[in-house]
Amino acid sequence: MKNRWPLINDNIIQEDKDALIAFLSQPNVRFTQSEKVREFEKQWSEWVGVKHSVFINSGASGNYIMASIMKEIKGKGEVIVPPVGWVSDVAPLVNLGMVPVFVDVNMESLSITVENIKNAINENTVGITLVHALGFNAVNEELIKLAKDNDLFLIEDCCESHGAKYNGRRVGSFGDVSNFSFYFGHHMTTIEGGMVCTNDDKIYDYIKMFRSHGMTREASQETKDFYSEKYPDLNPLFTFAVPGYNMRSCELNAVVGLSQIKRLDSNIERRVENLETWLNHLNSKRYFVEYNTKGNSNFSLPLILREPDKNKFEAVCDLLEKENIEFRKGTAGGGNQSRQPYLEKHKYRINGKLVNADHIHDYGLYIGNHTEVEKEQIKSLCRKLNEV
């Protein structure tokens, strides 16, 4: 049975389809990565406020590229990560022989705190993965300074937070490198797709090389010359500088992205308004509502019990199922990633107790927030939830 209130909706509208049809109707058009991809990358860089953007096949691929670059620059070591995040924030690390170190999140932004990061740093620490969960900003000046003072590689995962801001700047412009997801149902979509961003020219070369088999073809002339001079016996067109992947996207996805980005700001505005309505009408004695909403670009509507209560949480889930409202337990990525079985055969570390992450895992969920969700619909659901 179709959900009355789905978790995500299809962002594709007729305008996007018309753009695709117009592109497909051109004579001798190239479908693989070409001019439209480069145009989309340029527009995305301007929108986020970064120097460079590289279009790829998914946000998760971006996590692999960013982790691979961190390893190239810093070598193997420990990387501080949030337990509340997506699997691809952690899986690339263990696959690359690095060690994820989980520290607890705060409730206000569902992100790791400066104090918890400080307590986890040691001589083996090489980086921090900062996840902007559910549209909440996770960055601050103290965190940026902490990373810089300790010479740590700072990754920003912005896959759920397109357009979130800190001090007037969009997230994804603060770290060494950042990624975004354009999967179905996100703030905007390219059907499948993602973007990796940086302000660093060297990292930009790395991103392009890791995107396409590790080849130097798309790298800067300086990088090409370096490898040509060092390895004169190699064909410059087939010089593989890093152990790369094939994570390219194509022109069709870029055409959709170029159409979608025109509506991105208005879509975000609607999401933010819906979150405000949601938090203003929930019973604050029953549900946590004190989120740091400044500069948010809400991805979905969080619903976390204020106090542990298994019976009440089950009753909330029963109500949502009865109302035919789709939801996911544990918020982003199913809750506490350190409790997932994929880690059992790999080395990882938990620094301190994950009190908030476990509470979110056991007593939290989220429901959909998108342009089709109406304010009266939100108010009606809040009234019912407040009676549970």
PLM ranges: what are they?
Residues 30-31, 35-78, 92-94, 102-104, ...:
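Phosphate-binding glycine-rich loop
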Residues 64, 68-72, 145, 184, ...:
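Short, well-ordered alpha-helices that flank and scaffold nucleotide-derived cofactor binding pockets
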